Amino acid sequence: AGARYAGVIPKPRDGMGWQVDAERLAEEVAVSPVIVVLDAPWVDAAEFEVLSRFIDQRVNHLVVGAGANTARVGPMTIAGRGPCTRCDELLQQDMDPSWRTLSAQLALDDPPARGAVLSVLAAAEAARQVESAVQGTHSASLDAVLRTGRGGSAWTRRALIRHTKCSCWWASVNGTESG
């Protein structure tokens, strides 16, 4: 089966019923590998909820986003193993207790303008990361977030660590994770 468009992640700004629509989208994706395109180069609260379902359901996914000044690719999560987006978001909340509130506000606001060049760069890098994973070579986004700026600078890699409150690492503690 080839790639297909699954839909836009519903947000509170979409009106009543957005949570039901988000659950429906997550169920529709089921176990199909997916590229999650964000509104911006950060994860807002609504996107976090959908991504958390993908992690819990062990759906292979890659997070991609672009804004006016920066773009991100990653992390790529395979079979629910992390470090994952939830690890990154929990760490962000640990470092900045107001992040959860800000993240919820970002889900209400209209998305920022996207730079065309950054959107193309993010799409190209996402394709490169998926190709690496499919070929069985190490994908730089597997346990990291890659970022680039408006000037077209080189991609930088920020390695992620597993967060103790995230379920992505629990399988390894229980001895059920291979690898």
Indicate residue ranges for each PLM-predicted region.
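Adenine nucleotide-associated cytosolic modules
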Residues: A1-G179
